[in-house]
Amino acid sequence: MADINDPVLAKPADLCCLKGDFHRGEPTGSIIQIEGVDTYVAKPDPKFTNGNVLLFFPDAFGLHINSKLMMDAYAACGYLTLGVDYFLGDAVTKYSASPLNDPNFDLAAWSAKHLLPSEEIAREWVKNIKAKYGNDGKVKFGCIGYCWGARIVLQQLSDGGICSAGAIAHPSFVNESHVQKSKAPVAFSVPATDKLFSNEARTRVIEICTEKQQRFNMQVFSHVGHGFASRTRLTDPYELWAKEQHFKGFIEWLDFWLARE
């Protein structure tokens, strides 16, 4: 039952979260274990590293090919990029290709199973990441979240989080309290029409961030659907352009804020 005192802004994951394409390519990163949790590590070229760490919180497909290729792309822009398997091997890719191909898969039940545990896994993972990669005090952390990862980005931009700036694409499972508690600069990249994140919800996010004078930016793309940034239909030139613009915008946002003293 919804909490009337904490209105939903981005609705729970739905079948629209399972649409889109799997991309092709050869990931260049590697999987390591951080205190028992699979972690994808994409390293920047030492000649171009900016010395900062980017935490990647994936959509329901977890550490699948699309996520790995995106993390490699962020690493190519200078960030040591780390992605967490907060589904512990039970991501949607275990049951579904694109489009959904397992008629017995119950997305609502799967989401209920993982919603709170994934938050706790992410919280402990971040603590371990900071201990491993941030102890010298010189490293700055940023974060990126797609769909499922949106609220975890907002948590990391709140008191108790470690990130100086973050970015979110086509969110799900976000309540007003997640936005209210966030403090660090945040960027959004969203479709103009999204059944999970309505125009009214977008407007409310803008109102909240404006009222509390939080630094924010919001890209809104027409004629794309939920998932356009992470499961882009590469045969659609406009959708591919929107994906590239979202990526460029996120990099410029992170570069600006993580360069600040």
Swiss-Prot record:
It comes from the Eukaryota. The keyword Nucleotide-binding does not apply. Disulfide bonds: none annotated. Pathway: Xenobiotic degradation. Fusarium verticillioides possesses 2 unlinked loci, FDB1 and FDB2, necessary for detoxification of antimicrobial compounds produced by maize, including 2-benzoxazolinone (BOA). The FDB2 cluster arose as a duplication of the FDB1 cluster with rearrangement and expansion by incorporating additional genes. Belongs to the dienelactone hydrolase family. This is Dienlactone hydrolase 1. It comes from Gibberella moniliformis (strain M3125 / FGSC 7600). The gene is DLH1.
